[in-house]
Amino acid sequence: MREQLEKRKMEESFDLFNRYSFIRHMQANWLMWKRYLDKPVILDELNYRKVENLRMPQELDLFDASEAIRRMQATYGMLSNDIAKGFLDGVQYNSTLAPIDCLAMGRHLMNQSRWTIAEQWILAGIKAHDRKDPQTEMMLLRGPTKAELFRTLGKVRFEMRNIGEALKAYQAALKHSPRDLEIFQEYQNLKRRVLTLSPSEPIREEPNDDIEEMELPPCCSGRCERPQKLKRLYCVYNCVTAPFLRLAPIKTEILSVDPFVILLHDMVSPTEGALIRSSSKNQILPSETVNAANEFEVAKFRTSKSVWFDSDANEATLKLTQRLGEATGLDMKHSEPFQVINYGIGGVFESHFDTSLADEDRFVNGYIDRLATTLFYLNDVPQGGATHFPGLNITVFPKFGTVLMWYNLHTEGLLHVRTMHTGCPVIVGSKWVVSKWIDDKGQEFRRPCLRSHLDSKYLSSIEKIII
């Protein structure tokens, strides 16, 4: 009895010391910090921080980054654990994701009811926690603990109605944090919920990604087999679309005849590419597209930033315009301004057509549409970022100085459905491209409406090189 009294006195004494220390800290130490923060220098710093906070990543930025990783993962068929370890589509990098990053991805996917892939990310976070990678003090302070990861795993597995594994996850959480009252209460609630769970209770179903798979085709990696007829295509020196090309022909790679798709080489000099990129960096804004109501909007299916430049905006755009006219044989007076576009990590443009008119409206009221698309690549992309044509199974990876060009319309002036294309997600690096669309109106004598693209005597455009 005496020993118990002595022990109780010691505990009370220890508790008293703790309380006193805490009260002193909150009174004396905090007043000292308050006096320090009230100094003019600190007030200036706080005001500066308020302004800087507006430039810091916001909640929407984190959402966009998480969506970019999700789409990239789905497109290239990567496993969550591989991404966390820095193994991206067959290439190992000297970078990894921390447990807190994996947990953030898991929670993002949970908010979308994507339980299967969310489970993958939480498990990747648990494995990342076990890795011996050096973690910064901030990571260690912020967590998450292993108990928090297992707790989240239990929630995901319950939503998947994997009850047995959900209970095991909570048991593992309690093993790592046995005194956590919240986890214990959730575990008890889960056990009671299991007893009352009705078989007819609806499950929050995962979204159907079939449509997204069509919009982000599986061949963005370039590993799909090309059709036999495309393997027989060839490269030529184009010296027929402009007199100057007899002296300096352009290396032209024919990727498809119908629709007509080519790759022009050595079309941009390093100086021109650097000038366009530097002129754009302070002006680019989130890319807009035209919706069904014919209004501009920032759409989720296109994650990039862009800015428009007139053809005569600077010396580089003037030279590119002239060079493009010579290479294609088309009249650049009837073309749109340049659009400089930057795609960051995971940057994507889902499958789409570049034309805006329906075939029944194409020859009415003098409407103008995009006859051809030209895409200048301003840098090499370390991984990802290809342009893919699902209908042709052609994948073109960015290479500095090349220009991808194709006709959106048949020779009779109607939409060619196999010109649907995708800007595949960037895995590593950043992609800089310049688009220039060439109008159909004004090209009547360069590329007239014909019944067949083989009627060579009427053509003066780039298609002459295949005849």
Where are these regions (language model features)?
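Fe(II)/2-oxoglutarate oxygenase catalytic core
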Residues: M1-M405, L409-I467
